[in-house]
Amino acid sequence: SVVDKTKVDDLRTDTTGNITVDSISDNKTNLGLVNAFTDVSLAAANISVTDVVTLAQANTIHAYNTAAGTTVTLSSVSDAFSNVETLQGTAGVVMTGATITTTTAEAVTKANVTDLNNFTTAKVTVTSVQDSRSNVSDIAAINNAEVDMSAAAVTITDAVTLAQANTDVGNLNSLTTGKVTLNKVEDGRANVTTLAAIDNDDVDMSAAAVTITDAVTLAQ
């Protein structure tokens, strides 16, 4: 049967002999405490982790069970995309039902999000996105129960207009409550001026390459 640290503690009071665990489910802290017991072996145990872990933490736990065929099943993962990707490819680690959060340490693209959504049947939350306007819109269109970017910091890599970046519903700033950063802007002078006047906490074009599409005078 599946045990947790509380049950292991009970077993240790019942016997002075060594205890071999076949299956354990608990949070990462308790799993570490159980593994540290000199009279308890997790080497042949299938391990389920009940709280969120990073790649480094999952690797630590995966070192507890060294027997062939044993698994570490994760319920929640939070790390940079490349670390999540590495974890997904780690033999003996199961994350097909884990919630996944990619951190701001690494912005994700539409292609990355597609991979993440294929890693798990549970919800994927992305906190930083960087891609073309079309691809960012595609990510936002995915049901939030599958992929949620509603609070992500977003960087748009191709040129956008005022209409595309406006705060009105249906445009870029409506896709997230996070900051939208524009790398390129291309529009008429008046529209670019209006766009630049939007609060930088909402839409920031302060470092954008700007192309003015209509005629301007020296005075303008």
Region roles according to the model:
Residues 1-220:
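General marker for long, soluble alpha-helical cores
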